[in-house]
């Protein structure tokens, strides 16, 4: 649309004053006022010609104004005029927008390496308005200049071709759409862009992949950690868990499968229980010295998923540990002390251990009757235990040990029966056995804390029979308080 330039405009002039000044010359589309000048855009070119012819040199707000046709094109494409479709670059105050690209492009060859795109653009402005300039981007010593109009491009080609810029004669070549030069230039530009993009994308992908893998690792660790925390609430269970994890570390595939299966639902808890039983068989073999104790351990660990039986489970684990500790102590005593007293002590302890094992077996049986699901998993675990050859060897060793100990244990049985007949009734004998069981447990715990006090306590216990009676009475009362132990005694009596 035709635009009219107003020069020497008064600073007090407003849009209403300009509209009133141009009233009667046709339809005005836009009034754009600047500091000291302005532009008026008309709908028709003839109206603009009339306004320029008649109003040039007239007074507006006390000032004689200059009214001319606007020479340059619109610099801001804000208003919806026809010229804004050409895509002119914003300049002046509003120059911070992106440069607009046009089809009127010149290739500048033999460009000095010291000449930047800013210098080239400033130099080319003498031919016309430049919208885009670039130097040494696609190729070295070569630049690109884009003009607003075809006439500007032709003027630059005529006037500036062969002129010197920084001591070098530049050669201007029109960049036609079908020319090889443009294709190669555009290709090289697109290649460089695509390469940089692919590099960035690869980097970002690798970063995201590594972050994802680290996330998944941390998630699997946190899952397994939360699992172990929820299951091992007692200290004894957490210790056994840490031992299991140490033994699992050489077999990476198993640990991976376990960490993956941690996120799954609890419907697969039976399979997990079977896997745990197998792992317990592999881990617990060097530590467990009797097959019955080994079975009770594996059963109590397979029950660790059921939170209702936590208290009973703690008792069974601590019993198994106290039995192991007392076995080791009794063996070390029987080896170090050749006297008959130490032998009789170890024999009486082994007898008490046997009874404790029987009770733990009866407890586990009575519990397994109420829980049919855990019984199936235990049966599978016991079948697999019987299949494993290493467990058979250890069972044989345990049976050989028990056979070698059997004559000495029978002698200790006869002695203890004679003592119990002479001193106590049958009911007190049972409470004494329960008391001695508890003594062995409490001593095994105190032994781990204070080892030097062991022999003195055990001697005083065996010498004074009246002290053991009073202890057994007091401990039988405390045993009757705990529900799990009273249940196990009632099962063993029946």
Swiss-Prot record:
Q: Where in the cell is it found?
A: Nucleus speckle
Q: What does the entry's PTM section describe?
A: Extensively phosphorylated on serine residues in the RS domain.
Q: Where is the composition biased (Basic and acidic residues)?
A: 247-256, 268-278, 303-327, 411-431
Q: Where is the composition biased (Basic residues)?
A: 179-206, 214-246, 257-267, 286-302, 328-359, 367-382, 461-494
What are the UniProt keywords, alphabetically? mRNA processing, mRNA splicing, Nucleus, Phosphoprotein, Repeat, Repressor, RNA-binding
Instruction: Kindly list the residue ranges recorded as spanning the membrane.
Output: none
Question: Where in the sequence is Phosphoserine found?
Answer: 78, 84, 288, 290, 292, 431, 446, 456, 458, 460
Q: Which GO terms describe its biological process?
A: mRNA processing; mRNA splicing, via spliceosome; negative regulation of mRNA splicing, via spliceosome; response to insulin; RNA splicing; RNA splicing, via transesterification reactions
Bias (Low complexity): 449-460
Q: Which InterPro entries match?
A: Nucleotide-bd_a/b_plait_sf (IPR012677), RBD_domain_sf (IPR035979), RRM2_SRSF4/6 (IPR047190), RRM_dom (IPR000504), RRT5_SRSF_SR (IPR050374)
Its cellular-component GO annotations read: nuclear speck; nucleoplasm; nucleus
Query: Where is region (Disordered) located?
Result: 72-95, 169-494
Statement: the UniProt record of this protein carries the keyword Oxidoreductase: no
Q: Write one Gene Ontology MF term.
A: sequence-specific mRNA binding
Entry annotated with the keyword Protein biosynthesis: no
Domain RRM, by residue range, is: 2-72, 104-177
Function, as annotated, reads:
Plays a role in alternative splice site selection during pre-mRNA splicing. Represses the splicing of MAPT/Tau exon 10.
UniProt similarity note: Belongs to the splicing factor SR family.
Subunit details: Found in a pre-mRNA splicing complex with SRSF4/SFRS4, SRSF5/SFRS5, SNRNP70, SNRPA1, SRRM1 and SRRM2. Interacts with PNN.
Q: What is this protein called?
A: Serine/arginine-rich splicing factor 4
Give the organism, scientific name.
Answer: Homo sapiens
